[in-house]
From Swiss-Prot:
The lineage of its organism: Bacteria, Bacillati, Cyanobacteriota, Cyanophyceae, Nostocales. It comes from the Bacteria. Its EC number is 1.6.5.-, 1.7.1.17. GO terms for molecular function: electron transfer activity; FMN binding; oxidoreductase activity, acting on NAD(P)H as acceptor; oxidoreductase activity, acting on NAD(P)H, quinone or similar compound as acceptor. FMN binds at residues 10, 16-18, 96-99, 141-144. The keyword Oxidoreductase applies. This is FMN-dependent NADH:quinone oxidoreductase 2. Belongs to the azoreductase type 1 family. It comes from Trichormus variabilis (strain ATCC 29413 / PCC 7937) (Anabaena variabilis). Its cofactor is FMN.
Length: 207
C-alpha cells in the first residue's frame, strides 16, 4: 500500500483540464490499487503564502534559537514538508501559465525546498534528502505545443524547471503527461486530450 500526495494547482474549477486529468488518473488508480491512500491538497483554491522575511530567518537558523514569532513563521512549512516526506508517490496537476507553472505551485515549492529538510549543502555541494525511489507523475495542460527540437522548445520553462527542482530534492523518477495544443483549434485540442487520456491509461497500468 502506498500513500499518494495529489496536488492540483489550477485556480479553475470544473473548467480545469489539469484537474480533470489528474482526477481521472487517481480514480482509475484507486480502482486497481484500492489499498492505497490519497492525501489531497488544492493549491489553486487554497493557496499557501509566499515566503517572507520571518520565514527566511527561521529557515536559515537553528530551531533552538527560534522565538515564538519565528516558530510561527515556519510552522506551515514544517507541516507541508512532513506531508511531502510522508508520501510514497506524487501526482501533480499543473497548468502552464506564461510558459511556466502557476504562482500557487511555485509558492508551495518555495515552502518545501528547505535546507536540512529536503536538501543539504556542504563543501561538496548540494544533496537531495528525499528518497529517490519515489515516483512523480505530473499532468500538465498547455495552450500551445513545445516539441523538442523545434524553436518553440525554448519557451517551455515548465517541465525543465520541475525536473530540476524535484531532482534538487532527490526526486528523479518523474513522468510527464502533457495535454497541449489546447488553444490551437478544435481538432488539435481533441487529439491532444485523447492522447493524454491514452497516456493516463498506460500510466495506470505501468506507473
Amino acid at each position: 500500500m502506498a500513500n499518494i500526495l495529489h496536488i492540483d494547482s489550477s485556480p479553475r474549477g470544473d473548467r480545469s483540464i489539469s484537474r480533470k486529468l489528474s482526477y481521472e488518473f487517481l480514480t482509475s488508480w484507486k480502482d486497481t490499487h484500492p489499498g492505497d491512500t490519497v492525501t489531497y491538497r488544492d493549491l489553486g483554491h487554497n493557496p499557501v503564502p509566499h515566503v517572507d522575511e520571518p520565514w527566511i530567518a527561521a529557515a536559515f537558523s537553528s530551531p533552538d534559537s527560534h522565538t515564538p514569532e519565528l516558530k510561527a513563521a515556519i510552522e506551515l512549512s514544517d507541516t507541508l514538508i512532513d506531508e511531502f516526506l510522508a508520501a510514497d508517490r506524487f501526482v501533480f496537476g499543473v497548468p502552464m501559465y506564461n510558459l511556466n507553472i502557476p504562482s500557487t505551485f511555485k509558492a508551495y515549492i518555495d515552502q518545501i525546498v528547505r535546507v536540512g529538510r529536503t536538501f543539504s549543502v556542504d563543501a561538496n555541494g548540494y544533496k537531495g534528502l528525499v528518497d529517490s525511489s519515489k515516483k512523480v507523475l505530473i499532468i500538465t495542460s498547455r495552450g500551445g505545443s513545445y516539441p523538442p527540437g523545434t524553436p518553440y522548445a525554448a519557451y517551455d520553462y515548465q517541465e525543465p524547471y520541475l525536473r530540476a527542482i524535484l531532482g534538487f530534492m532527490g526526486l528523479t523518477d518523474v513522468t510527464f503527461i502533457h495535454a497541449e495544443s489546447l488553444n490551437m483549434g478544435e481538432d488539435a485540442r481533441e487529439k491532444s486530450l485523447a492522447d493524454a487520456k491514452d497516456a493516463i491509461a498506460q500510466a495506470v497500468a505501468n506507473w
